[in-house]
Every structure is written in structure tokens, then in C-alpha cells.
Regions:
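An acidic, low-aromatic, low-complexity terminal/linker signal
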Residues: 1-170
Length: 170
């Protein structure tokens, strides 16, 4: 690789790190830690009764009535092909705002446990690794190395932008 190409790659990586730096709400799924940009988070609620909706993707648990607004609830464990688990004491629903092709919408994301809000600085962020052509990593913003642990930073718009990823609710 020429020194000019190496400099350009390093500059793009630095720009990516700068653009991703900021506050993230971190949460656990199975044994991994993930992070969401805190500006996308509207609230965190305890698991409540979820109304099952027929003929939706397997990872859509159903809908909830949140102060008169019906929102879809997605089990991220199932969306990420992890083993399904019953709700525990620390299970929570993170209500996030997404900008999808159909418009701006609220979605409840079911997670094992909410951890903390972290201020992630540019030096702690690495670009998403490549795993070959067969693995889609477009939903990952990057990887953060914070306090000796790895956090997978998610772009929930990309997680859910696939056609039919979420049911239409009123």
C-alpha cells in the first residue's frame, strides 16, 4: 500500500472515530455488550404485557400500549439469531426513535439488561471488522473498547430498514 493510500485510510478512520464519538446507552444481550446512540433513546421501561400480533417476523414479540401510543416490540436476541430467553428481573424495553423509509417511528427493543450511559471518545472506537462477503455488518457503527471491554455500537435504523422488518401499527 502506498503511503498516500495509507494516509487516506488513516484519515477516513479518524473521521469515522470523530463522527461516532459521543454518549451511548449500553445494554447486554447474552454475553455481549452493545451500545445505542443516546439521542435515539426516548425512554427505558420495565417489561409489560405484550400483545401478540399474528403473521409478523419471529423476532417481533408484538405491540405495547405506551401512554396511548401503540409501538412494536422487537426481541433483539431473536433478531440477532441468539437463543430465546424468558424475561428476567433486569430485562427491559428500550424505546427508540427510528428514521425508516416509511417515516419516523418509535420501537421498543427488548434487551436482557440495561447497563449504563457511556461517553465514548474517538480513541476508544475502531471500525467494524470485516468477516467476508457472507456476513452483513452494515448494522454496526463500529466497535468501542471501553474499560477493558468491547461494546458493539449499533445503527438500529439499519437493523430494521429491511422491507417488512417491522409490522405497521396505528
Amino acid at each position: 500500500m502506498s503511503s498516500k493510500t495509507a494516509r487516506e485510510t488513516e484519515q477516513r478512520s479518524s473521521e469515522l472515530q470523530q463522527s461516532l464519538a459521543g454518549k451511548y446507552l449500553t445494554f447486554a444481550l447474552a454475553t455481549e455488550e452493545y451500545g445505542l446512540p443516546v439521542l435515539r433513546v426516548r425512554e427505558i421501561i420495565k417489561v409489560m404485557d405484550i400483545t401478540v400480533v399474528p403473521q409478523v417476523p419471529h423476532y417481533v414479540r408484538g405491540v405495547i400500549n405506551l401512554r396511548g401510543k401503540v409501538i412494536a416490540v422487537v426481541d433483539l436476541r431473536l433478531k440477532f439469531s441468539l437463543e430465546a430467553m424468558p424475561a428476567g428481573d433486569r430485562t427491559a424495553i428500550i424505546v427508540v426513535e427510528l428514521d425508516l423509509p416509511a417515516g419516523r417511528t418509535l420501537v421498543g427493543v427488548l434487551v436482557d439488561a440495561v447497563s449504563e450511559v457511556l461517553n465514548i471518545v474517538p480513541d476508544e472506537i475502531e471500525p467494524t471488522p470485516t468477516f467476508g462477503d457472507q456476513v452483513d455488518t452494515t448494522f454496526m457503527l463500529g466497535i468501542a473498547k471501553v474499560k477493558g471491554t468491547v461494546k458493539i455500537l449499533l445503527d438500529l435504523n439499519r437493523v430494521f430498514e429491511a422491507e417488512g422488518a417491522l409490522p405497521r401499527v396505528a
